[in-house]
Amino acid sequence: MNPSATPLRWGVLSTAKIGRTTVIPAIQRSEHGTVVAIASRDGEAAHAVADDLGIPQAFSSYEALLAADDIDAVYNPLPNHLHAEWTKKAADAGKHVLCEKPLTLDRTEAAGVIAHCEAAGIVLQEAFMYRFHPQWLRTKQLVDGGRIGELRAVQAWFSYFNDDAANIRNVAEYGGGALMDIGCYPISVARWLFGAEPDDVQAIAHHDPVSGVDILTSAMMRFGTAHATFSVSTRTEPYQRVHVIGTTGRIEVEIPFNAPTDRPTHIFVTAGGSPPADPATEIEEFAIVDQYTLQADAFAMAIRDGRTAALPPSDALANMAVIDAVRTAAGAA
């Protein structure tokens, strides 16, 4: 990408729902990027989405999109088991890659992808959009600034209901399951807030008897003398919440991951001294933003400035290592 005001030209691999409904519109609203192409193995589907979203080019193969010389970067929302293959192929084509989470199926595969992209000289980032939302930047600022004292615990719940056997999230060989799809979020949050990797991981999981994917996974990560705990499920009432607890206060993040784009978000900060006899709770409100747009602009700026992405590949590798550890601790294959 020419280090100028020229927008980053994006190509999108597949007509996946997350791209159609969320990420593509967000990039189209961004300051530093534009979507110029979309590809699908179903050419009619690619053209239909392109027409619907106003995308100039539609390709009937991923290879054709990667061969186009007017594309700077690729957004990869393919099923998890295809992340590694097509991220590498995009790198070989000289395209920067924003890859949906989790980056790969395991740490070993992630290490190979990262090395491949480094050798190709392209910018690679795992798409954890929540990290760009002001509510999380503020939460991190409060924790690092000592507003709640010493960080002692992070607790998270994230769930939705999906029992469609044909859905990729319920297919084991595609990298489906609650841990891979949404467990990666609380793991990422805990590592980021503690600024460290866990010393120990314990976990339990319940698996669907037919598909074999985990449908309820709970884990505890030890960070020195502090703990992070989470439960994720794909077969319970949709809900998400994160509690960040310190020695002299706590923070509750109301909608931590799927922050809405149609209303403000809030965090609840309770800090009443040590010990807090009757602490007051302050509600901090954040203006309406699209965290996917913020992510796209940050990625484009990193490429323009010739620097590593805001979430470097090393972070994706470390997160994948913890996912592996949770799987192992829960007794999964």
Question: Which functions belong to the PLM regions below?
Answer:
Residues 1-7, 73-75, 298-333:
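C-terminal helix-rich "cap/oligomerization" subdomain common to oxidoreductases
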Residues 130-209, 227, 333:
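Predominantly a Rossmann-like dinucleotide-binding segment in NAD(P)-dependent oxidoreductases
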Residues 1-53, 332:
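N-terminal Rossmann-like dinucleotide-binding module
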Residues 207, 211, 223-295, 312:
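NAD(P)-dinucleotide binding in Rossmann-like oxidoreductases
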Residues 49-55, 113-117:
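Short, conserved SAM-binding/catalytic segment
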Residues 73, 79-80, 84-131, 146:
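Beta-strand-loop-alpha-helix segment that lines the small-molecule cofactor/substrate pocket
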Residues 55-62:
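Conserved SAM-binding strand-loop segment of SAM-dependent methyltransferases
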Residues 37, 57, 72-73, 153:
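Short, Asp-centered acidic motifs that coordinate Mg2+ and/or phosphate
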